[in-house]
From Swiss-Prot:
Listed GO MF terms: rRNA binding; structural constituent of ribosome
Protein's name in the database: Small ribosomal subunit protein uS15
Organism: Magnetococcus marinus (strain ATCC BAA-1437 / JCM 17883 / MC-1)
CDD domains the record matches: Ribosomal_S15p_S13e
Transmembrane segment boundaries: none
Recorded name of the encoding gene: rpsO
GO biological process, one term: translation
Family the entry assigns: Belongs to the universal ribosomal protein uS15 family.
The entry's keywords: Ribonucleoprotein, Ribosomal protein, RNA-binding, rRNA-binding
Subunit structure: Part of the 30S ribosomal subunit. Forms a bridge to the 50S subunit in the 70S ribosome, contacting the 23S rRNA.
Function, in words: One of the primary rRNA binding proteins, it binds directly to 16S rRNA where it helps nucleate assembly of the platform of the 30S subunit by binding and bridging several RNA helices of the 16S rRNA.
GO cellular component terms attached to this protein's record: cytosolic small ribosomal subunit
Amino acid sequence: MSITAERKQELIAEYATKENDTGSPEVQVAILTERINNLTDHLRGHNKDHHSRRGLLKMVGLRRRLLSYVQKEDRSRYQDLIKRLGLRK
């Protein structure tokens, strides 16, 4: 259900803006998106797992706030990020 340390390092390497960058909004959104996708797959098979559903909603809200921040700061970074993650049409 959670992501492995190797997968997290791959995401950090792919979305980092500079070396040793683990806290930028892009990296945080990428990791959250991976966790959201994993949890969504879990909930398809376990539709009565309401505790996990609550965690999913909290993660979606956090990702939305981070994306809103990136959009306010730099529109081109926002467009690039959602395109790379495949979030919106």
